[in-house]
Curated annotation (Swiss-Prot):
SUPFAM superfamilies attached to this UniProt entry: a domain/subunit of cytochrome bc1 complex (Ubiquinol-cytochrome c reductase), Transmembrane di-heme cytochromes
Gene field: MT-CYB
UniProt name for this protein: Cytochrome b
The organism of origin for this protein: Walterinnesia aegyptia
Positions of heme b b562 binding: H75, H174
Subunit text: The cytochrome bc1 complex contains 3 respiratory subunits (MT-CYB, CYC1 and UQCRFS1), 2 core proteins (UQCRC1 and UQCRC2) and probably 6 low-molecular weight proteins.
Function in brief: Component of the ubiquinol-cytochrome c reductase complex (complex III or cytochrome b-c1 complex) that is part of the mitochondrial respiratory chain. The b-c1 complex mediates electron transfer from ubiquinol to cytochrome c. Contributes to the generation of a proton gradient across the mitochondrial membrane that is then used for ATP synthesis.
Length: 372
């Protein structure tokens, strides 16, 4: 029996000795998911999915329910930390070429889409002013689909406008989708351990492995403790840091907010949507802003897996990160110059990464062959 099997038999998962802190975000995401399900359950006990009572029920949770304000704020801040962790997790995957493990990457992209849908449904539930108008604008994008659009929108709304049936089904979906996320996360982890984790060098780490426990369990615990500390610091000192002030007013279908925007973690996609002055084009760009991640495994051309030794690709990667932040920032601003042109330029840069990366991989291969 090989040493690897002996380690597995001893309940010690063999892991590459050189995986860095960037590999800790998976366990942090799992912690976030558990936190969201636990706090969400306690919130659901007291929440009322009715357009006349939803806003009041959220106020009731924060004011009257014992420790309700902690549950509500943990759930809201936890969602933001969840997305911070998942964006870092995806960026790590792009940088170190982890997308070459196709099954893991594609299951992860599916997880991201379901997570975004879950967060969107959750944002609508308090039935505040921004909740209502963000839901109206985003669901209305379905009407851009030729032939089927209007029928699909009416079906999703449960009527001819956003109303009580919409809120009820959004609550049902927001409750059930996290369980889908749990099952998909299990598949994601099983598929990962089918091949094993990669490492920063992008090389095979079979020759140099150490037991997962105690080395990586302590390393994971450190990052989880830091994340929990950040969560409780925000909760204690600035619980409304990541909330929209507009959402503290009850939804009013007769008054449109001056500037409609979703939560900060959707602003990159919303910024891309707004940068195109055409409804169908904008909707396609919005969908592609996430779906384009699925192309990464099929367009990789470099002989080197990781970007660690590819300076040209590193420049393009960090441009993508800067672009992501820029689009997020411009999406918080009104639709007026210079923000329109900044948003359009940033959107072009965002999509160009997925075109430039394979071209640079091919160029780097040529340079290496010349040096040989």
């Amino acid at each position: 029996m090989s040493n690897q099997h002996i380690l597995l038999m001893s309940n010690l998962l063999p892991v590459g000795s050189n995986i860095s802190t960037w590999w800790n975000f998976g366990s942090m995401l799992l912690t976030c998911l558990i936190l969201q399900i636990m706090t969400g359950f306690f919130l659901a006990i007291h929440y009322t999915a009715n357009i006349n009572l939803a806003f009041s029920s959220v106020i009731h949770i924060t004011r009257d329910v014992p420790y309700g304000w902690i549950m509500q704020n943990l759930h809201a801040i936890g969602a933001s930390l969840f997305f911070i962790c998942i964006y870092i997790h995806i960026a790590r995957g792009l940088y170190y070429g982890l997308y070459l493990n196709k099954e893991v990457w594609l299951s992860g992209t599916t997880l991201l889409i379901i997570l975004m849908a879950t967060a969107f449904f959750g944002y609508v539930l308090p039935w505040g002013q921004m909740s209502f108008w963000a839901a109206t604008v985003i669901t209305n994008l379905l009407t851009a689909i030729p032939y089927l659009g209007t029928t699909l929108t009416t079906w999703l709304w449960g009527g001819f406008s956003i109303n009580d049936p919409t809120l009820t089904r959004f609550f049902a979906l927001h409750f059930i989708l996290p369980f889908t996320i749990i099952s998909l996360s299990s598949i994601h982890i099983i598929l990962l351990h089918n091949e094993g984790s990669n490492n920063p060098l992008g090389t095979n780490s079979d020759i140099d492995k150490i037991p997962f426990h105690p080395y990586h369990t302590y390393k994971d615990m450190l990052m989880i403790i830091i994340m929990t500390a950040i969560l409780f610091l925000i909760l204690s000192f600035s619980p409304n840091l990541l909330n929209d002030p507009e959402n503290f007013s009850k939804a009013n279908p007769l008054v449109t907010p001056q500037h409609i925007k979703p939560e900060w973690y959707f602003l990159f996609a919303y910024g891309i949507l707004r940068s195109i002055p055409n409804k169908l084009g904008g909707t396609l760009a919005l969908v592609m802003s996430v779906m384009i991640l699925t192309t990464a495994p099929f367009t990789h051309t470099s002989h080197t897996r990781s970007m660690m030794f590819r300076p040209l690709s590193q420049i393009v990667f960090w441009t993508l990160i800067a672009t992501f932040i820029t689009i997020t920032w411009t999406a918080t601003k009104p639709v007026e110059p210079p923000f329109i042109s900044i948003s359009q330029t940033a959107s072009i840069f965002y999509f160009s990464f997925f075109i430039m990366n394979p071209l640079l991989g091919w160029t780097e291969n040529k340079i290496m062959m010349m040096n040989d």
